[in-house]
């Protein structure tokens, strides 16, 4: 006979554990428990049946996996938390008694901990770390712009600024930046590093007000972990480029707001690090390295001579009757692969601004423009008001583009193009240099579209040009307007107006207006409803009569398949169909609006 399982000893009750039970098991306070969960990556779980997991109770509680809590029992940082509590109690006791020497001695022996082993546990490979640095970069850039308060220390802000600047220098040096988008929340960037798409947001450098309803203790715990993570990532990235980490900082330039120009990148020499180490075998290998290289070079030369002799002998031999088969690659797959490779390379044109030299006026955001221009190979100088360290002045003749954000320029220099900052971002996102006349100072800028939106097959593409029929409609409307006949171009003359394109509110207003007109004409409401239903039936009948035989068969087949569906499938089908029709109507309305805008533009040009 099978053994009867006791209640609460198996199943969900054993897999999950409540937060209060976890606190008792770990002997930690709630604040320390939250810290260790954030650092170790342990988060609450949602069981399928809360009542079974809570042993029959329906009280609202937070659940964790029992294995995760058991895993935290062996974490060394938990013991450090306990040691820190003892240290804080002794320090407060010494300060209360006025024993300053004892307090200094205790402060010198303050317990500290390292997050290195946690980083290695959570991210076994470098690619795993790259996949998870989006949030880390966003939070580091956020705290780098925060003011120093009693909740945010100066050392924290300075360390965040350093880590962010180091990462930006890597992106500039490796030409990894792909997209940049100006939004209301901030500036979105996307870089491609070792095949991983990394997206982060940088806030604008305005005066920040620290909110009072934010729990900075939890944010500081995340920030502590992200700082350790970015230290590892930056070290690995710099090593891949052969750069010394951390880079040197010019203190004088940094104090005078030089920004990225205050960092000096140096090439690292890994050979002395091996020579001065304690590995004797490495020293022996390096000592015999030259002789090995010489032997390899000589062997390669002998191989080349032998191959030349064999080719000469093959040329002297007569041709044989048996011809080898030539295997040509298929036109489809190979061409598609090559096209995709070429399109990928062209879409990520990393040397877009390599032939240009930019100068930034004092009213433009230097912190962003300097980064994106240098990431695409350009040279940048700026007004002294924006900070020191500019490589050239405003009057330098090497400047090709002058970026400003004002309607009129009092003094213009010959030989340079004056543009607004949006030209830089739009050129980066499209991978080509945009027309500069559209972005001239004081000009109405084209819409700044997000490069992160992927346009579907049937979606509206704002960058797509009008079709030939739509252009004909615009030209016909212009001719009619010139001749004095005002014809709207938002709908075609031969097609009836699509009522579904009108919003619900507008449709109700039109219906109410028709009812009022019928009432004013002396028509009763019941007769008005009958007339509307009759007209609707007539239009449906007219549409059925205009259908071809193939369309009728297709429609009947759809109706039959719909009849064979279950009630659930029929509801789902109608829901999807309604969503598609709504999207189509919305896209048509946007296309009509675009045609109206094109008409107004052409009228302005002609007038």
UniProtKB/Swiss-Prot annotation:
GO biological process: assembly of large subunit precursor of preribosome; maturation of 5.8S rRNA from tricistronic rRNA transcript (SSU-rRNA, 5.8S rRNA, LSU-rRNA); maturation of LSU-rRNA from tricistronic rRNA transcript (SSU-rRNA, 5.8S rRNA, LSU-rRNA)
Pfam families, per the entry: Pescadillo_N
Gene3D superfamilies: BRCT domain (3.40.50.10190)
Coiled-coil regions listed in the entry: 497-604
Gene Ontology terms, MF aspect: ribonucleoprotein complex binding; RNA binding
Gene Ontology CC annotation, any one: preribosome
Region annotated Disordered, chain positions: 301-341, 531-607
Domain BRCT: 348-441
Basic and acidic residues compositional bias, start-end: 325-339, 544-561, 595-607
Biased composition (Acidic residues): 313-324
Family membership: Belongs to the pescadillo family.
Described purpose of this protein according to its UniProt entry: Component of the NOP7 complex, which is required for maturation of the 25S and 5.8S ribosomal RNAs and formation of the 60S ribosome.
Quaternary structure and partners: Component of the NOP7 complex, composed of erb1/SPBC4F6.13c, ppp1/SPBC19F5.05c and ytm1/SPAC890.04c. Within the NOP7 complex erb1/SPBC4F6.13c appears to interact directly with ppp1/SPBC19F5.05c and ytm1/SPAC890.04c. The NOP7 complex also associates with the 66S pre-ribosome.
Full protein name: Pescadillo homolog
Source organism: Schizosaccharomyces pombe (strain 972 / ATCC 24843)
Gene designation per UniProt: ppp1
């Amino acid at each position: 006979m099978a053994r009867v399982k006791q209640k609460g000893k198996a199943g969900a009750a054993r897999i999950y554990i409540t937060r209060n039970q976890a606190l008792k098991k770990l002997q930690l306070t709630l604040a320390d428990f939250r810290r260790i969960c954030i650092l170790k990556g342990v988060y609450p779980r949602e069981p399928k049946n809360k009542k079974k997991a809570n042993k029959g109770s329906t009280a609202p509680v937070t659940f964790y996996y029992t294995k995760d809590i058991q895993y935290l029992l062996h974490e060394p940082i938990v013991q450090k938390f306990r040691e820190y509590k003892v240290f804080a109690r002794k320090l407060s006791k010494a300060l209360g008694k006025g024993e300053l020497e004892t307090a200094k001695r205790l402060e010198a022996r303050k317990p500290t901990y390292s997050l290195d082993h946690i980083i290695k546990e959570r991210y076994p490979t470098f690619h795993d770390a790259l996949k998870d640095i989006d949030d880390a970069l966003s939070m580091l850039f956020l705290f780098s712009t925060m003011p120093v308060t009693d909740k945010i220390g100066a050392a924290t802000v300075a360390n965040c600024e350093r880590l962010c600047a180091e990462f930006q220098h890597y992106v500039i040096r490796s030409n990894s930046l792909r997209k940049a988008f100006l939004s209301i929340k901030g500036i979105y960037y996307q870089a491609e590093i070792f095949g991983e798409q990394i997206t982060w947001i940088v806030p604008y450098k305005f005066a920040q007000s620290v909110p009072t309803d934010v729990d900075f203790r939890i944010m500081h715990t995340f920030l502590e972990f992200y700082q350790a993570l970015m230290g590892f990532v930056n070290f690995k990235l710099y090593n891949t480029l052969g750069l010394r980490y951390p880079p040197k900082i010019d203190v004088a330039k940094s104090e005078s707001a030089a920004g990225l120009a205050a960092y000096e990148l140096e090439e690292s020499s890994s050979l002395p690090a091996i020579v001065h180490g304690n590995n004797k075998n490495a020293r022996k290998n390096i000592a015999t390295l030259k002789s090995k290289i010489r032997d390899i070079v000589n062997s390669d030369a002998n191989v080349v001579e032998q191959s030349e002799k064999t080719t000469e002998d093959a040329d002297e031999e007569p041709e044989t009757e048996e011809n080898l088969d030539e295997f040509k690659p298929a036109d489809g797959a190979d061409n598609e692969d090559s096209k995709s490779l070429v399109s990928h390379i062209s879409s990520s044109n990393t040397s877009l601004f390599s032939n240009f030299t930019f100068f930034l006026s004092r009213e433009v955001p230097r912190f962003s423009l300097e980064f994106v221009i240098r990431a695409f190979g350009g040279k940048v100088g700026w007004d002294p008001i924006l900070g020191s360290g500019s490589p050239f002045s405003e009057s330098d003749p090497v400047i090709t583009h002058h970026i400003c954000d004002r309607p009129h320029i009092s003094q213009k220099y010959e030989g340079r193009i004056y543009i607004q900052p949006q030209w830089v971002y739009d050129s980066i996102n499209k991978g080509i240099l945009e027309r500069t006349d559209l972005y001239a100072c004081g000009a109405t800028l084209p819409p700044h579209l997000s490069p992160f939106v992927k346009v579907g097959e049937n979606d509206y593409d704002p960058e797509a040009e009008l079709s030939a029929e739509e252009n004909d409609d615009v030209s016909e409307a212009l001719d009619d307007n010139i001749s004095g006949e005002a014809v709207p171009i938002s709908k075609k003359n031969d097609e009836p107006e699509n009522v579904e394109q009108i919003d619900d509110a507008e449709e109700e207003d039109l219906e109410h207006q028709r009812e009022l007109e019928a009432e004013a004409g002396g028509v009763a409401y019941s007769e008005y409803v009958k007339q509307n239903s009759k007209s609707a039936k007539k239009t449906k009948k007219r549409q059925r009569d205009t259908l071809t035989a193939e369309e009728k068969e297709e429609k009947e087949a759809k109706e039959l398949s719909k009849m064979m569906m279950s009630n659930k499938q029929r509801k789902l089908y109608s829901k999807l169909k309604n969503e598609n029709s709504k999207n189509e109507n919305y896209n048509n309305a946007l296309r009509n609006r675009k045609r109206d805008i094109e008409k107004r533009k052409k009228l302005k040009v002609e007038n």
